[in-house]
Amino acid sequence: QYLALWDSGIKDAWFPGPIFEMTSQWTLLRRSPEWIDQEFNHFTNYISGTHRSLGHNDNAYNNPYMFEYWANKHGVEIMSRIFQETTLDDKTESGQLNFIKTYKRLTHINQEQLNEEMYDAASRFITWDLPRIEMAYAARGANVHTCQLVQLGVTYRISPERCPSNYGYNGIKLTVPEAGTTVKVNFRGIINSSEYNIHKPNNAQWRYGFLAVLKDGSRVYGEPSKEDIGSASLQVPENTEHLWLVVAATPKEIYDTGADNQWPYQFTLDNTEPDGDKCRVIKK
């Protein structure tokens, strides 16, 4: 962490928040892909906090996984470059340096592409579909995401306690219908509610879609949607063992990494329902 601080591209300025701890945990994950077994408590804390914003202080010791996703996509050098090639242009509106803005600039992607990556990563994290850690995480880490919903008639709403912040996500486990059945989510983003901490509602955006995990461990990713009021569907493959709805908060603007603003949503389902084992449903 000390070396990373002095490796910064800007002297006397550095990233706020837990990026140093997150990077330390990522280097441990690179050395020991079976990190889940060495510090399982950090993994369970991560699973209970996937809704938190990327870079949230509460995930400092729990979340090296986006860095692993980036390293898999661009090579391990991307992490050192984020520290070495930071510029003052990588500040958010509040004036904080932001490692997500640095990553976006270094990889030459726009906000739309960044948001697509965030959803892709969230979907892969359900089964740890990343080459270096996939096998090590299969036994204890795959298909264990949890969630909490509030049920209002036939409508399910994400609970305030598990509502995703910036680039946070929810893995919602569903019951598996007969093969060949088309499951559908009818989604509606919420931008006006006193139950949630909503900031700059005009920046609201989500991505959501299905993931089917087959008995042999292979995966079928459904086509995600990003409409504030829209739908996504998937025809359930043969030999499906697990079925997931993945919802990621992908706002149109990059916020401070520790921001707690929330992006709530609600939905109805066709031909499936939340699995009561991994997804707690509170009826009202």
PLM region spans:
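Beta/coil-rich, acidic/histidine-enriched accessory regions frequently appended to metallopeptidases
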Residues: 90-284
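Zinc-dependent metallopeptidase catalytic helix centered on the HExxH motif
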Residues: 1-37, 44, 48
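Long, well-structured alpha-helical subdomains associated
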Residues: 36-86
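Stable alpha-helical elements in mature extracytoplasmic
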Residues: 19-23, 27, 63-66, 75-82, ...
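Residue-level recognition of short, structured coil/turn motifs
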Residues: 7-11, 32-33, 75, 104, ...
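Structured segments of extracytoplasmic/periplasmic soluble domains
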Residues: 2-5, 27-30, 34, 69-77, ...
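Short consensus segments that form the blades of beta-propeller domains
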Residues: 13-15, 57-58, 198-202
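Short catalytic/ligand-binding loop motif for oxyanion handling, primarily in non-cytosolic enzymes
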Residues: 10-12, 89-92
